[in-house]
Curated annotation (Swiss-Prot):
This is Transmembrane 4 L6 family member 5. Residues 31-45, 111-156 are extracellular. It is a multi-pass membrane protein. The chain crosses the membrane at residues 10-30, 46-66, 90-110, 157-177. The keyword ATP-binding does not apply. One of its GO terms (molecular function) is arginine binding. L-arginine binds at residues 123-128. One of its GO terms (cellular component) is membrane.
């Protein structure tokens, strides 16, 4: 596969993943679809905006850059086999890789610690000391009185962020290697076009 075609495929995969992360993080801000608890009772991992910033915006840029690097075109005055766009894609992919790692680490921590909720009359991270074992014991989830169903909400959305960021790490890594090859060797489409 040409570096250009690979870049386009990776970019078209990264863009929807970044949008999924942005939407998931936005939903984490409104537990159970209500804004009643948004001001004072959201967990730190929600406020760190890992899905919006890390898995979202920091991955959206390399996605767009990879799509552009996969397109035909010249940069500057003469054609350079798309090497300039590939070079930009190398840097963007490195930034996207860091963003996806940030999203993975914050979301994984959010899953391990659990949500901040009202239990036994106090707002706290009641599952923090369980080291994530609450994830397997669904009977504990109902112990949180407010926000209603917050554990299910957080587990679902943080799991989605973890899965999306793992895919983003993989795709950004592939694009980092692919774009580096594209910078060094150029795009093979020019060679294919001349042989036909």
């Amino acid at each position: 596969m040409c570096t250009g075609k690979c870049a386009r495929f990776v970019g078209l995969s990264l863009i929807p993943l970044s949008l999924v992360c942005i939407v998931a993080n936005a939903l984490l801000l409104v537990p159970n679809g209500q804004t009643t608890w948004t001001k004072d009772h959201l967990s730190l991992q929600v406020w760190l905006m890992a899905g919006f910033v890390g898995g979202g915006l920091m991955v959206l840029c390399p996605g767009i850059s990879a799509v552009r690097a996969g397109g035909k075109g010249c940069c500057g005055a003469g054609c350079c086999g798309n090497r300039c766009r590939m070079l930009r894609s190398v840097f963007c992919s490195a930034i996207g890789l860091l963003g996806a790692i940030y999203c993975l680490s914050v979301s994984g921590t959010g899953l391990r610690i659990g949500p901040q909720c009202l239990m036994n009359g106090s707002w706290d991270y009641h599952f923090q000391d369980t080291a994530g074992s609450y994830l397997l014991n669904r009977t504990q989830w109902n112990l949180c009185v407010e926000p209603p169903d917050v554990v299910l909400w957080n587990v679902t959305l943080f799991s989605l962020l973890v899965a999306a960021s793992c895919l983003e790490i993989l795709l950004c890594g592939v694009q980092l290697v692919n774009a580096s090859i594209g910078v060094l060797c150029g795009d093979c489409r020019k060679k294919q076009g001349s042989s036909q």
